[in-house]
Amino acid sequence: MEFIMALHMRDQLISALSAPAPGEIEKHKANVEVYLEHPAGIGEHSDITEAIGVELDKISRYHDQLEVINHYFKKR
């Protein structure tokens, strides 16, 4: 019984760690799309390439987190 509870807790923790990443990725992808489609409309960002780079870094962070969780911690 204790083993089953530990497995359930493990699955819950992995799920909790994985859950926010897809939404964050979509949010930052949307920001990049805004920069690409309407660069003149973004007045507070004079360096569009730098702003896009920041968004790409954020996408990479969440993508990498999912890759690590899936590669090292999810059961096969």
Locations of the language-model features?
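Extended, charge-rich alpha-helical interface modules
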Residues: 2-76
